Amino acid sequence: MSRRHKAEKREINPDPKFGDLVITKFMNAVMLHGKKSVAESIVYGALDAIEATAKSEPVALFHQALDNVAPHIEVRSRRVGGATYQVPVDVRPERRQALAIRWLINAARGRNETTMVDRLSGELLDAANNRGSAVKKREDTHRMAEANRAFSHYRW
């Protein structure tokens, strides 16, 4: 770790359409090679598709999907006397959000639909209904933490 001053958190602006900071973070995570306008059209297209199919507020459904994917506990490796233990630890809120965003995007990229808009809207709908690859990833993480509960006293 650096002994100098801590890096300041950068200020990000809320997205222009919904005025939501989390959607901006999501957009930045979808973005590849600095192409923000492409990422913006993908995310807004997916939210419009959700609104058309689910007939509900897309931002609320997006936040519901993020909450369903976000892990509450994870395992971290801890070396104790020559042995490496997988120690369950609570996930900080910022990391919880970042993991949920990353898992949703990776799950969407792994789907079979033709366009990224379709893949992302499908994964968001699945996550909002507690199914899909991203939710499975969260359940696997929780299962790992539960299996290693015996090592929770090694927490730091």
Swiss-Prot record:
InterPro entries: Ribosomal_uS7 (IPR000235), Ribosomal_uS7_bac/org-type (IPR005717), Ribosomal_uS7_CS (IPR020606), Ribosomal_uS7_dom (IPR023798), Ribosomal_uS7_dom_sf (IPR036823)
Swiss-Prot/TrEMBL keywords: Ribonucleoprotein, Ribosomal protein, RNA-binding, rRNA-binding, tRNA-binding
GO molecular function, one term: tRNA binding
GO CC annotations, alphabetized: small ribosomal subunit
Pfam families in alphabetical order: Ribosomal_S7
Quaternary data: Part of the 30S ribosomal subunit. Contacts proteins S9 and S11.
Family: Belongs to the universal ribosomal protein uS7 family.
Function per UniProt: One of the primary rRNA binding proteins, it binds directly to 16S rRNA where it nucleates assembly of the head domain of the 30S subunit. Is located at the subunit interface close to the decoding center, probably blocks exit of the E-site tRNA.
NCBIfam families reported in the protein's UniProt record: rpsG_bact
Protein name: Small ribosomal subunit protein uS7
Organism for this UniProt entry: Brucella melitensis biotype 1 (strain ATCC 23456 / CCUG 17765 / NCTC 10094 / 16M)
Phylogenetic placement of the source organism: Bacteria, Pseudomonadati, Pseudomonadota, Alphaproteobacteria, Hyphomicrobiales
Gene: rpsG
